């Protein structure tokens, strides 16, 4: 998820260079088209799908399409995410819920959709992109830090619950990486 640009695109490109077939999604067709163009420019044949990963029915439908059109999902990278840099007391509950929905609920929904096929295949890998904010927190990122902290624990629970099916689930908690999403913060805090 979230592999049209930025960290997700870099991860998918590295995986493609190791022989993986790349399948990605984004919430809008124009973003899928941009992603497909970027993969083509990089010499990678990728498959793109439009899907709102916070919508369980849409995710289940997308996973069915991918399995039918491309094949089994052996590796899932849950990378889609958003951040709202708003002081906590200025953030509305709706804004807080939106971040939790994309950064925590969506990885749950997508993992839940692919795990049955992974069990049937005899295993698989799930990689959740967490964040150093899951450990640290910082001003103006309360929803993001809460979501990534929850994702870290979800990762541990998936690993514990589905390891017996040869499904490994790991989290990666990168620090600040220069992407369009982190550009506003770099302007405010150039030292990270």
Walk through the language-model features, giving the residues of each.
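Alpha-helical segment proximal to the catalytic Tyr-Lys
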Residues: 116, 160-164
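Residue(s) in the substrate-gating loop at a strand-loop-helix junction
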Residues: 131
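Substrate-binding pocket helix/loop in short-chain dehydrogenase/reductase
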Residues: 87-88, 95-100
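Canonical Rossmann dinucleotide-binding motif of NAD(H)/NADP(H)-dependent dehydrogenases/reductases
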Residues: 1-22
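Active-site loop immediately N-terminal to the catalytic Tyr-X3-Lys motif
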Residues: 86-89, 136-142, 164-165
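A glycine/serine/threonine-rich, flexible loop-to-helix segment
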Residues: 164, 176-192
């Amino acid at each position: 998820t979230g592999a049209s640009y930025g960290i997700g695109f870099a991860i998918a490109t590295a995986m493609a260079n190791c022989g993986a077939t790349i399948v990605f999604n984004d919430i809008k067709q124009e973003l899928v088209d941009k992603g497909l163009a970027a993969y083509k420019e990089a010499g990678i044949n990728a498959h793109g799908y439009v899907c709102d990963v916070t919508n369980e029915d849409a995710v289940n439908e997308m996973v069915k399409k991918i399995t039918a059109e491309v094949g089994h999902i052996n590796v899932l990278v849950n990378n889609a995410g958003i951040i709202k840099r708003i002081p906590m007391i200025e953030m509305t509950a709706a804004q807080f819920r939106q971040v939790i929905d994309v950064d925590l609920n969506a990885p749950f929904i997508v993992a839940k959709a692919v795990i049955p096929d992974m069990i049937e295949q005899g295993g698989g890998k799930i990689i959740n992109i967490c964040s150093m904010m899951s450990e640290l927190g910082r001003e103006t990122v309360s929803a993001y830090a809460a979501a990534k902290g929850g994702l870290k624990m979800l990762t541990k629970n998936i690993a514990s619950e589905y390891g017996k099916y040869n499904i490994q689930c790991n989290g990666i908690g990168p620090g600040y990486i220069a992407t369009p999403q982190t550009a506003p913060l770099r302007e405010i805090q150039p030292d990270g």
